[in-house]
UniProtKB/Swiss-Prot annotation:
This is T-box transcription factor TBX19. It is found in: Nucleus. PANTHER family: T-BOX PROTEIN-RELATED, T-BOX TRANSCRIPTION FACTOR TBX19. GO terms for biological process: anatomical structure morphogenesis; cell fate specification; heart morphogenesis; mesoderm formation; pituitary gland development; regulation of cell differentiation; regulation of cell population proliferation; regulation of transcription by RNA polymerase II. InterPro entries: p53-like_TF_DNA-bd_sf, T-box_DNA-bd, T-box_sf, TF_Brachyury, TF_T-box, TF_T-box_CS. Coiled coil: none annotated. It is linked to ACTH deficiency, isolated: An autosomal recessive disorder that is characterized by adrenal insufficiency symptoms, such as weight loss, lack of appetite (anorexia), weakness, nausea, vomiting and low blood pressure (hypotension). The pituitary hormone ACTH is decreased or absent, and other cortisol and other steroid hormone levels in the blood are abnormally low. CDD domains: T-box_TBX19-like. One of its GO terms (molecular function) is RNA polymerase II cis-regulatory region sequence-specific DNA binding. It holds the Pfam family T-box.
Amino acid sequence: MAMSELGTRKPSDGTVSHLLNVVESELQAGREKGDPTEKQLQIILEDAPLWQRFKEVTNEMIVTKNGRRMFPVLKISVTGLDPNAMYSLLLDFVPTDSHRWKYVNGEWVPAGKPEVSSHSCVYIHPDSPNFGAHWMKAPISFSKVKLTNKLNGGGQIMLNSLHKYEPQVHIVRVGSAHRMVTNCSFPETQFIAVTAYQNEEITALKIKYNPFAKAFLDAKERNHLRDVPEAISESQHVTYSHLGGWIFSNPDGVCTAGNSNYQYAAPLPLPAPHTHHGCEHYSGLRGHRQAPYPSAYMHRNHSPSVNLIESSSNNLQVFSGPDSWTSLSSTPHASILSVPHTNGPINPGPSPYPCLWTISNGAGGPSGPGPEVHASTPGAFLLGNPAVTSPPSVLSTQAPTSAGVEVLGEPSLTSIAVSTWTAVASHPFAGWGGPGAGGHHSPSSLDG
């Protein structure tokens, strides 16, 4: 069918009638609140109690170069417009006084004359122009307005930092002759424009009532979030592909690198001591405020851990505590590790622990049978050296010389390609008996 034929096709009378009925029902709720004379015009501020709570501690709004949205969001309800007339809604911000403000000793005080403002920015609601019935059918939200401290256009409102403003709504009737119908403002919506929140009470209120905000994290937490991938829920998979080398962080989770196909559906059981290192979400803001966000990372449970960190020589070294943060010496010891060259399976017997270290002849994959390695007593693994000085009772291991090592964890499988495994003494995992069960602070590759 030719394009001209498509362009000239007309909808049937039934289709047109249906569309008109949809429009009519949409505007009917607004018509019921209308007044063709506009004498009963009324504007109500939505969420007035929330605005009042912010005003009691002097509200602050962030202004940035690229623009920042307001919270609380300015939202109003209008009644008494002519349902069949066309109106546009505009928003601007007027200074409330002739001062510049500063925050001193926990309060806002005047600090000199204000900056001269040579610009006047007006925000036009994106639904403008529209019928009065449209404006009256539901609350009107100015959620898309952005506040900036740079004059860059794009519908943003430019404000001077450390000046106090009050939003002002204008209703203009459009048609053959435009005319101002009304303008209104609400004192509880006043705020001081800032580039960073000054009052911690305001910060806490913003976090409490705006759980989607990202601007309220402390600098320490923001730096921490730059070093780790974006927060995910427990039901999602996580992939760390750009961290360079293997990193076993202090918390219960494991961060893997070098292979974007490695995914963990659940954290491996490597609990952490009481330390701020590792993949975790800081639950408090500046030490005492609660954040409304779910925990972004696996939390600590204050128990011992084993840290594996890749050295420059691509050897995997074990750090067990603050007193032993140096490389382990490589000394031959014949009685430590038995490595028979065999392709047959090894049946070491049952183990009560949820995490098993398995060695297979392949290149490391999530499936496939292979000989297993079980630790009968607490221990850790060292990659790269053929033997390490350690008591012979630490680990009983049988494996081929070149193998792929798999970690069987519930509910996921993870693979690590290695050449040789040896054993050294270390602190036990959580829940294992034996000496050295106390937690120690270990270095982490995720230190901020």
